[in-house]
């Protein structure tokens, strides 16, 4: 695997549950799998209790390179949603999905996911996506 990845929450959950396999462990350890703010916030929202929140946040910051959204992110998410609407599939993508897809496009990353919505986005945009599980 020679590509770099932006991990979505759906894949991040599988990774931390140890469902992803050793290939992904190696890629994460090598710094080839990054994280963006919408995913960090969505993941941490599900963490129970204050100590667990800070422990999980520290771990995310230590393990994953951070990919920031560029200034045009909102205009680009609007354009992506319109592109999906033109294809009749705009209801598939949540605001977080749109942000993840656009941030990945901005940095030329492959979206690492376990969410059929990214497959739908990829069919419309042609952007690279990969499922963390098979």
Where are these regions (language model features)?
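Short, well-structured N-terminal submotif of metal-dependent ribonuclease cores
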Residues: 1-38, 45-58
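Acidic, PIN/NYN-like endoribonuclease modules and their adjacent C-terminal/linker elements
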Residues: 2-4, 101, 105-134
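Phosphate- and divalent-cation-binding pockets in alpha/beta enzyme and binding domains
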Residues: 42-43, 76, 120-121
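Active-site-proximal, substrate-binding regions of enzyme catalytic domains
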Residues: 51-72
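Histidine- and aromatic-rich ligand-binding microenvironments
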Residues: 7-8, 36, 92-94, 131-134
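Alpha-helix capping/helix-boundary segments
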Residues: 11-12, 39, 73, 100, ...
């Amino acid at each position: 695997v020679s590509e770099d990845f932006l991990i979505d929450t759906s894949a991040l959950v599988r990774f931390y549950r140890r469902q992803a396999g050793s290939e992904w462990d190696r890629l994460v350890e090598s710094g080839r799998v990054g994280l963006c703010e919408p995913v960090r916030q969505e993941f941490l929202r599900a963490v129970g209790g204050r100590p667990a929140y800070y422990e999980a946040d520290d771990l995310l910051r230590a393990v994953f390179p951070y990919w920031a959204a560029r200034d045009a992110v909102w205009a680009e998410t609007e354009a992506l949603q319109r592109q999906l609407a033109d294809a009749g599939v705009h209801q598939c993508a949540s605001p977080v999905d749109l942000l993840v897809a656009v941030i990945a496009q901005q940095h030329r990353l492959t979206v690492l996911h376990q969410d059929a919505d990214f497959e739908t986005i990829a069919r419309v945009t042609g952007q690279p996506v990969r499922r963390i599980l098979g």
